[in-house]
């Protein structure tokens, strides 16, 4: 991959971190409300 520098590394980490937190939050909320048992 060519490092063009158009996207800051901290921005990629921030978006990735928010995505992981959102997925974990939805999974915990789904399992807490009983919807996670159907997955």
Curated annotation (Swiss-Prot):
Annotated Gene Ontology cellular components are: chloroplast thylakoid membrane; photosystem II reaction center
Q: List all membrane-crossing ranges.
A: 9-29
Q: Which domain of life is it from?
A: Eukaryota
Q: Which Pfam families match?
A: PsbJ (PF01788)
Keywords of this entry? Chloroplast, Membrane, Photosynthesis, Photosystem II, Plastid, Reaction center, Thylakoid, Transmembrane, Transmembrane helix
InterPro entries recorded for this chain? PSII_PsbJ, PSII_PsbJ_sf
GO biological process terms on file: photosynthesis
Write out the annotated subcellular location. Answer: Plastid, Chloroplast thylakoid membrane
Membrane topology term reads:
Single-pass membrane protein
Q: PANTHER family attached here? A: PHOTOSYSTEM II REACTION CENTER PROTEIN J
Role of this protein: One of the components of the core complex of photosystem II (PSII). PSII is a light-driven water:plastoquinone oxidoreductase that uses light energy to abstract electrons from H(2)O, generating O(2) and a proton gradient subsequently used for ATP formation. It consists of a core antenna complex that captures photons, and an electron transfer chain that converts photonic excitation into a charge separation.
Q: Which NCBIfam families match?
A: PRK02565.1 (NF002722)
Q: Which proteins does it associate with, and in what oligomeric form?
A: PSII is composed of 1 copy each of membrane proteins PsbA, PsbB, PsbC, PsbD, PsbE, PsbF, PsbH, PsbI, PsbJ, PsbK, PsbL, PsbM, PsbT, PsbX, PsbY, PsbZ, Psb30/Ycf12, at least 3 peripheral proteins of the oxygen-evolving complex and a large number of cofactors. It forms dimeric complexes.
Q: What is this protein called?
A: Photosystem II reaction center protein J
Q: Tell me the gene name.
A: psbJ
């Amino acid at each position: 991959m060519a490092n063009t520098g158009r996207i800051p590394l901290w921005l990629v980490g921030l978006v990735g971190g928010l995505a992981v937190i959102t997925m974990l939050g939805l999974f915990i909320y789904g399992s807490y409300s009983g919807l996670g048992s159907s997955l």
